[in-house]
A protein has these predicted regions:
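Metal-dependent amide/peptide-bond hydrolase catalytic core
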Residues: 1-106
Length: 106
């Protein structure tokens, strides 16, 4: 297209984070695992996420310690008819609250 050739779009990248890794033995992660166990009386399995999320920006750009956790299951996340079980939601609230309180008291 002649017009497009003479009026190329200008693309500006305002953020980029790329992939990231958070070591499982990091104190932040270990503290969360303990909080999860304290609330649920079960161990949480640490796995990688196949989806993109803002954690990459916090880790790679801001240098923050991060992890991803939420109610529901990874296989169903961001799919058609996505939903979260109410009990899972309530459990996540308790886990978050316990983690925040115990991490803040370190």
């Amino acid at each position: 297209d002649p017009w497009m050739r003479n009026h190329m779009p200008k693309i500006t990248m305002y953020q980029s984070g790329g992939a990231f890794e958070q070591k499982e033995d990091a104190p932040f992660v270990q503290s969360f695992k303990k909080a999860f166990h304290d609330v649920t009386d079960t161990e949480i399995k640490v796995v990688g996420s196949p989806a993109g999320c803002d954690s990459r920006l916090w880790k790679r750009i801001a240098g923050a310690q991060v992890f991803q956790y939420g109610p529901g299951n990874q296989e169903q996340c961001h799919s058609i008819n996505e939903y979260v079980d109410v009990e899972e939601f309530y459990k996540a609230i308790l886990v978050y609250a316990h983690f925040i309180l115990t991490w803040a008291q370190r």
